[in-house]
From Swiss-Prot:
GO molecular function, one term: RNA binding
NCBIfam families (UniProt xref): PRK13251.1 (NF009724)
Protein species of origin: Bacillus subtilis (strain 168)
Protein name as catalogued: Transcription attenuation protein MtrB
HAMAP family: Trp_attenuator (MF_00798)
Length: 75
């Protein structure tokens, strides 16, 4: 596994119930491959891997990366 993939991760903390965290695949076709639903206060640490190229957050959450911190908004 490429070392870069194993070190890139994000911390996502739900600010409201029902936050969806969706993993998307690498390759010629980007596809959904994993989903988690978080309730208020729950935290997930998501990692970019050889299979995961993007992470989508739907709902209000605090997102922390090596590049900084941001907050997603309600739809």
């Amino acid at each position: 596994m490429n070392q870069k993939h194993s070190s890139d991760f994000v911390v996502i903390k739900a600010v409201e119930d029902g936050v969806n965290v969706i993993g998307l695949t690498r390759g010629t076709d980007t596809k959904f491959h994993h989903s988690e639903k978080l309730d208020k206060g729950e935290v997930i640490i998501a990692q970019f891997t050889e299979h995961t190229s993007a992470i989508k957050v739907r709902g209000e959450a605090l997102i922390q990366t090596a590049y900084g911190e941001m907050k997603s908004e309600k739809k």
